[in-house]
Amino acid sequence: MGKKKIDINTREDLFLSYYKEIEKNKFDLLKICSDKNFSKSNFLKAVHCLFSLSYFCKIKDENEEEEGKEEEINDYKVKKSTTGNYYRNSEGKLFKKSNEKDQIDDVSIFYKRLPTIQDFKDTYDKYENCLNSVYYIIRKIKLLHLEYFWEILASCYGTISFIKFFNIFSNEIFSPSENGDSVFIMVGKFFRRKVRAETHYDLIFLKIILANASIPMILKLGVKDIGRFTEKEDIIVSYYRNFSIIHSLRFDNVKEFALVYKTLKNNYPSKKKKKITLFEENGKINVKTSKKDLMLFEFVCKFDCVKIFKKYFLPKPQIINNNDNNEMLECISSGSYSGFDEKSKRKIRIFFSICCRQISPKILKCIVDYVKDDIGFLDLQNRQDIYIGDSAPEKVLFLNCFFGNHKEQRVIDFFNLLTSKSIIICNTIKEKPELYDYRYITLSTVDSTFYFSDSHKGADFGVYTDEINVIINNDDIDYDYIGDDDNDEEIEETKDYGSSSSDIDDFYNVFEPKASMIPNILDSCSLEILKAYIQNITGNGLFKISPSLFLAHDVTRLVRNPKPKTETVVKILEFINTISRLSELSTNGVPFTFLTNRFEIVTSIIMSLHDERSISNSVEPVQWLRALAPFVSNDEMKLIIYKVRTLYNYEPHSNGEIKYTELVRLFDVQYLLTKGKFSLSQFNGFETSIFLNPKLLDGTINSNILNSMIIKDKEKLDLKELFFKEKPLSEAELKEKFEIATKNEKELLDQLKKENDAEKLKKKNKLKKQKNQQQQQQAKQQAQQQKQQHQQNIQQNYENQHIEDQRKFNQQTKGRPISPSSIQNQNLNPTLLQNQNQTSNPTPNLESTKKATPTTTTTTTTNSNTSAIINEIKNQDLNQQQNITENINEIYDVSIGKFKFNKKESNILGRGSNGTLVFKGIWNNRIPVAIKQMQKMFNPLISKEIEILIGLTNKNLNLVGYIDQEEDENCVYLGLTLCDGSLQSLYDQSKLNEFINQNNNQNNNNNNNRVLDLIIGMINGVIFLHDQNIVHNDLNPRNILVKDNRLIISDLGLSKMNVSSTYNFSTNAIPTGQDGYHPVEVLLEKRKTKSVDVFSLGCLIYFIMTNGAHPFGDKFSRLRYITKSKYNLSQLSNLNLVATHLIELMISYDESKRPTLSSVLKHPLFWDSLKKIKFLESSLRLLGDHDFKKFNINKILISCNSNSSSSNSICNSSNSSSSSSSSISSSSCKISSSSCYCVPLPWNQSLDYQLVDSLSNQIEKKVASYKFDQLHDLIRFIRNTLQHYNQIYRDLKQILPNSDILESLKSQQSALNYFESKFPTLIIFLFNHFSAIPEIKNSIHFSNDTCSIF
């Protein structure tokens, strides 16, 4: 909007136009004010409307006052003259022309750096029209009282125009208006309502206010809509007249606070302070005091003004010897160092009082962080023997808290906050008096008082206990200047405004301590508050509680309080009795905390402490009643005894007897009510005598009463034993008992040593006897062998002699034949030779026949001798067998049925939970077995386990075998296959690598085949279990046993049946799930499926192939990394990427993504050479199939290449994260090189150039063309090489007879190994992508039997 020229010829038309313009401008102004999307441009329009309105009002008023001054009215009706630089007005007068700046817009004054009207006049004194506009605005400034206009100004106060407006018209704005208020009072309402953040213009505005306005005006600023106060706070605020500072406190504006506080401080100088007194009159709270100083500290805490508090209230530490570090360290170690002086320490304690009174967690946290190294911090490491209650520890904050209408959780969180920051509250007695001299006890000086009230809904302390997220910026605030005014003065900062000791001390003196801490905590009847307080003063259990902490009269207030429930009081008293061991301060174990006339509490305590479960460890009822007798009336005692009788007669025991019935009968009502029959010391009254001295209760019973009761009691109970315990021993008696105990201990040690020596000697003799028996047995065997050899020699000689005799006989008989029967009937024994030696030249006549009779007798005698020798040998065998049996009985001294074993520690193979043990033993006196002993009581599913073992035995060679079972009264004994050890034992003995590589030469292929055979056997065993619907659920190196160079699975399906026993060959049984071989669903106790075993097998495969490593790190961090799916396969990925790929699938976090075991066996890791070749051929056919042209393998590789960290390789980034680190770090989620399978490009650079040239230029006299940047051509190159390796070998040998490539072309297997070494990730890359696409996986190219890989 620019200036409008009005062409009016008559006076009447002129005035009519004036009024129309005025109304039009008013309408525009109202329209702009109602616009919600108010902007800077709208603000300028509004100001222009105002100036136009003022201008027309000026014209209107002047014409009404002086009708004859038309020359002033007709300034806008100028007709320019054509002559030179002059023009004539309507009356013909000649005026000099103004230049271009003379026509300046009224609003332009707000764009220039002209802070005052005088500056403006000095700049534009040559331009009459512009100056007149400004003067008319000043004269008509009363229009600024329009509220809707100031709503606009307050909304956009941060623009430079608004600040300039105040600078120019400040005098008129702050001058009183017709109603007595200045325009500023009206503006302040909107200003304080809109302003929140502390900006440069906000501070300039305050400077204008503080420089021009009077204090009464300031006090009326920003009263409404700032904050709600309680009735008491309203009175204090009103009295001290500090409305003006509430805004900066409300929004924690530091510099704004400094400006306002300095002005108010200067206007209200400090005077001597007096105590504030609040009294109630006619239902209203009033204040009576003569103090006039400001009290800001409560409101600093009320609004959590952390930045203001830290900058202006916290004292500055005074460091001693800041330049000499060594001397300062000596001061610290000697305890003489102090970061604060005594005045500062007291001030800090007072700040504790301020912030806790208003429940200000942020301010409290600020103080705690600021002073924790200098005050209130206890060195817990060096003071572990401190008793809170003895001499006060160093650097402990002495506090007394008063809880009014407490909010339980806030009080608890307050104590927890101090505890988390190592601030120990000490509410102790400075000088420890005697216990019974309670009247002279003086408590420590109260340094702070805490008051918690529900009336103020401040922030909770709980959010600041563990992690305090309060940002305190103590630096000077750097605000960017929006405008271009370089002449603004810097705001003067005033520091340490609130550090005046008089102000703070006066606030502290306002409220006197109401009570000590323990009574008020007990009055709250909150067990949680009490626990939080005890946790604080004990430093989380590092300190012991002094018995003097809980005074008897404080506890008496608790049990006398009629408000809390009986159950609550009972729980609190039990807690006190537990932590402070109050029984040490009483006689015969009777805690004095229960001396009360509230018998319903007494009986409740007795019921809770003397139930059937703890009756044997509790104080006997007689002691409770005896302690209560002096302090209760007769009627109360009758009721107590009645309730005690009811308690112990309520439920009979299983055998029909009632425990303590006869004991309670002793306490007849008349007997207990006769107090004079007890020789107890006299007390001075209930209040002073409640602090009992243990010696005061030592008394005797009248002998007549005792005799009469013994006669009356038929069972003749020994009352002395019931009423009295053994008195404390004297020092001499204690010393004597100690010497006797030492002597007995020495004798016992000597006896144990003798027994050990005797055991060693017995064992030595036994070994010596066994050695002698072995030597004797060897001698007998040698003698028997010699005898057998001798018999054979004799037999041979006899046969030779018999043939010679027969030949001679035939010669004598002239060739007559000899019948075979005659030869068969002859006795072939050694004695015949002797007889024939005695008879020379035998003849077949009668005489010789007669001499044959004695020969037969000799033969019979010889047969008898041979039988005797045989019997002797049999007897020796029997004796030897008997000796072996005796030796077995000596070695295995425990016999259960057919099992024999020894329970010595050296004979234990393993331990399990619930008392399960595995022993080495024998079955049927000859077969070595592993004997598993299981407790019947703790293993209810033993029969189920045996049933499964029997059903699975001999059906799979990779499962542990069942042999037999026996049982006795308590245990069941299973005979299982005895193995050589477990994978874990091999690893512990550093023999795992030796076991895997045994029976192999240096060929890596043989070693790999050995490893794969072991893994396949283990997987087949688990597959067999799954086929039987059994989930093992506990596969780990301790349950994988070694037998005959095979891996055998033990603990078959016990976790599936919830049997907690284990079969481990380890001396340390680890609970299920704690060794890191269980997936996350087992750790979270979710449903268990077969995928649990897949996860465990993946970890075991990694264990075997890396010589004992684990995918999830060491045993201390495995569980945490399993739940976060953080694994590290780097130890294997450098050796075998194919195995890494398989393991990564098997240990997937999501159980649905883990492969089945049948799919695991189809993984390329277990492929032979034929299957790999078939796979490459099928892949080549697939990539050339027209139906799968849309599957561009090279496009996939290029996409992977863009995600790879290297620009010269193509990667399969199935998982985006990869790392070469060998350890699992918190920053990396998954570490595995298998997450990126790379094929170098161009691929011909990875091969020997002789091979590439040979295959490219001459294959069966045909030239083959290959694209070295295409993976399809690489597969074709490999296929052609494998098919024509013989021809390529012959061609290269003729050209390069000494080339190294010839070794790789001797066979198809060697050629395949060559390509696998050059491209180790090729097959797994193709397998991974093909298996993810159903159309390819189910295509005809992979459906035949030779290549059914998916």
UniProtKB/Swiss-Prot annotation:
It is a single-pass membrane protein. One of its GO terms (cellular component) is IRE1-TRAF2-ASK1 complex. One of its GO terms (molecular function) is protein serine/threonine kinase activity. Signal peptide: none annotated. Residues 903-1166 form the Protein kinase domain. Residues 809-823 have a biased composition (Polar residues). The keyword Nucleotide-binding applies. InterPro entries: IRE1/2-like (IPR045133), KEN_dom (IPR010513), KEN_sf (IPR038357), Kinase-like_dom_sf (IPR011009), Prot_kinase_dom (IPR000719). Keywords: ATP-binding, Coiled coil, Glycoprotein, Kinase, Membrane, Nucleotide-binding, Serine/threonine-protein kinase, Transferase, Transmembrane, Transmembrane helix. Residues 1169-1346 form the KEN domain. PROSITE patterns: KEN, PROTEIN_KINASE_DOM. Its EC number is 2.7.11.1. Glycans are attached at residue 37. It is an enzyme of class 2 (transferase). ATP binds at residues 909-917, 932. It catalyses: L-seryl-[protein] + ATP = O-phospho-L-seryl-[protein] + ADP + H(+); L-threonyl-[protein] + ATP = O-phospho-L-threonyl-[protein] + ADP + H(+). It holds the Pfam family Ribonuc_2-5A. Gene3D superfamilies: KEN domain, Phosphorylase Kinase, domain 1, Transferase(Phosphotransferase) domain 1. Belongs to the protein kinase superfamily. Ser/Thr protein kinase family. This is Probable serine/threonine-protein kinase irlE. The gene is irlE.
